[in-house]
């Protein structure tokens, strides 16, 4: 069985791989964005990666950010196409994202989830708050049940904005 490490992307190589995988998924594969998917939120979002322990390759991504005190969002959740069999990576990224935010004072954790992934999130103790369209694609605004995502020991790093630039 393949194993993965779920962690904050902290060094230049991890951050470059994080943005490259996002670009491959959201701009090239899904064509939700032209060129790349970097936006203003990336200036204050924390990137989280799934790393295949055997190869040290970044195979999954998600970002978290505090929209206002206590209100956190997750977004840009994606898995490398060659690693999509099963839900292990997505589940691990979601768990790492929500438990990390919960450690840092999260009172509510939200995400806009593509329609095809809503049932998966519901199995992970999320509820749909409303249906919406983003870039003409159906999504649900969903909320995590924080009681299933206990705080961990992750120390909140100081953001290094230049390192967050897309490569």
For every predicted segment, state its role.
Residues 43-44, 70, 135-139:
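Short acidic/glycine-enriched loop/turn segments that link adjacent beta-strands
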Residues 49-51, 141-145:
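Short, well-ordered beta-strand micro-motif
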Residues 100-114:
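Conserved GNAT acetyl-CoA-binding A-motif
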Residues 115-138:
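Conserved active-site alpha-helix within GNAT-family acetyltransferase domains
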Residues 79, 85-99:
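Conserved acetyl-CoA-binding loop-helix of GNAT-fold acetyltransferases
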Residues 1-47, 51-57, 153-167:
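Short amphipathic alpha-helix that is part of the acyltransferase structural core
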Residues 82, 92, 102, 119-123:
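Acidic/histidine-enriched, beta-strand-rich ligand/metal-binding domains
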Residues 49, 56-66, 70-78:
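Conserved beta-strand in the GNAT
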């Amino acid at each position: 069985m393949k194993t993965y490490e779920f962690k904050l992307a902290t060094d230049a190589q991890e951050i470059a791989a994080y943005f490259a995988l996002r670009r491959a998924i959201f701009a090239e594969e899904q064509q939700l964005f032209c060129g790349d998917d970097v936006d203003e939120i990336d200036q204050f979002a924390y990137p989280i990666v799934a790393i295949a322990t055997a190869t040290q390759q970044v195979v999954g991504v998600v970002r978290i950010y505090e929209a206002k005190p206590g209100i956190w969002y997750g977004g840009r959740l994606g898995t490398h196409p060659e690693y999509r069999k099963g839900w292990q990576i997505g589940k691990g990224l979601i768990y790492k994202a929500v438990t990390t935010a919960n450690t840092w004072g999260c009172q509510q954790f939200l995400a806009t989830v593509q329609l095809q992934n809503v049932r998966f999130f519901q199995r992970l103790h999320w509820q749909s708050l409303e249906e919406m369209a983003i870039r003409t694609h159906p999504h649900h605004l969903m909320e995590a049940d924080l009681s299933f995502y206990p705080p961990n020991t992750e120390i909140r790093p100081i953001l290094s904005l230049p390192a967050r630039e897309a490569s």
